[in-house]
Amino acid sequence: MAGLRARGGPGPGLLALSALGFCLMLQVSAKRPPKTPPCPPSCSCTRDTAFCVDSKAVPRNLPSEVISLTLVNAAFSEIQDGAFSHLPLLQFLLLNSNKFTLIGDNAFTGLSHLQYLFIENNDIWALSKFTFRGLKSLTHLSLANNNLQTLPRDIFRPLDILNDLDLRGNSLNCDCKVKWLVEWLAHTNTTVAPIYCASPPRFQEHKVQDLPLREFDCITTDFVLYQTLAFPAVSAEPFLYSSDLYLALAQPGVSACTILKWDYVERQLRDYDRIPAPSAVHCKPMVVDSQLYVVVAQLFGGSYIYHWDPNTTRFTRLQDIDPQRVRKPNDLEAFRIDGDWYFAVADSSKAGATSLYRWHQNGFYSHQALHPWHRDTDLEFVDGEGKPRLIVSSSSQAPVIYQWSRTQKQFVAQGEVTQVPDAQAVKHFRAGRDSYLCLSRYIGDSKILRWEGTRFSEVQALPSRGSLALQPFLVGGRRYLALGSDFSFTQIYQWDEGRQKFVRFQELAVQAPRAFCYMPAGDAQLLLAPSFKGQTLVYRHIVVDLSA
């Protein structure tokens, strides 16, 4: 029985056959060719390289070990966010002779090992600011022979170790958008081949590296809507009282003089108080001997002077203005001469006379009647060369100039501004040593006149059909003129020092403005535009760097 094999166990022959089969399998396996790496039809691939022609998109089915990719004559126009993120080992990328026009933000995100990036001979007209974000290993970048006219500011900032940059063969427009590049080229350690401007004509064929920074005039300004006051108004007067900033608005539509207070925390105008005024045309605040008064001029129902009582924190009526002297007020001007306070009221009624009032101890008293029966529309006080003057515009004759007589302590007629017989409003400003008048007209052109020593001469005419309001003002060394109209938008002009004229600067959508008021409020420079038909708008003056 010892020679018998156990039941169910393999015999020697079967074991030998199994061993032979295993050996044959090993031989067959050893002769099988290596597996072909994945490769799209438009590409030729090896284990670590890919060369693609006429691709309709960034190829996705590529070997994961690819470190070099070339795209030629691709049929798509934009490289989008993360287009190559599936190739994290990529070290070399060539994009040549493609139809690209735009490369977006984060287009090369995920390529932290990329060292060489060549984007050449394409039709790229724009790069996004963060196109090259994430390329921390990039040492060589070529953007040669594309259609680039500008480059976003600081586009190369993410490229910490960039050694070589090629921007040749582009159509760079050397305007303010390129100023940053000139500054960067002057300080970078990156080697950059010479590049040249294609435009503007004055810089054409100039080397970008050699452009003087002083040739770039890139700082401009703008008036942007800052706050909307949801009510009409016909006058606006800012004033300081007890270190706070306020604004008085005449609002006949709500039968009040509205007082707003500037909130320095919220940086907005807030409701503060109201003075009853059913037909107010002007609310003039005056701070005399630390006391606040508001002269309320009304078309009907009489005009009054109110006093602010700090103990009761309310306005109380202090004084009535004789309705026989002030019948139909249209404008109000307050000023100080030789230490005394005055205000003048322009009377637009046929039987009225513009009147001057003087402060004396506890009230304002009639001091002088000026210019009777001429339907006066506006007043402008001018204190220049030590000679206080009051200019009165009228709808029935040329503006009249009065000069203060210190002997008589009254205004004495000095002459007329004959160039503008029907001015609605009159304002003045100084530029250098010259004095100018701005006169608005409802029909015809508004005029800018310059004082020539003995007379005014016209220097400029501004189209202004339907104008009842204009205002020159100065903001940070820049001089502007706001010119309103009942039939079109408000025009903002800026003074050109070289030409000694105003040039059109900006258009503001203000309906039927009745005044313009410049109001500095901390670091905010504000222009208020009270509207007779719509909302009162507050614009902020901002400085814009076009090279940013």
Curated annotation (Swiss-Prot):
GO biological process: exocytosis; regulation of exocytosis
Family matches, as SUPFAM superfamilies: L domain-like (SSF52058), Soluble quinoprotein glucose dehydrogenase (SSF50952)
InterPro entries: Cys-rich_flank_reg_C, EAR, EPTP, Leu-rich_rpt, Leu-rich_rpt_typical-subtyp, LGI_related, LRR_dom_sf, Quinoprot_gluc/sorb_DH_b-prop
Domain (LRRCT) ranges: 170-220
LRRNT domain residues: 31-64
LRR repeat spans: 89-110, 113-134, 137-158
Cross-referenced PROSITE patterns: EAR, LRR
Gene3D superfamilies: Ribonuclease Inhibitor
Entry keyword DNA-binding: no
Signal peptide boundaries: 1-30
Protein name stated in the entry: Leucine-rich repeat LGI family member 3
Taxonomic classification: Eukaryota, Metazoa, Chordata, Craniata, Vertebrata
Gene this chain is encoded by: LGI3
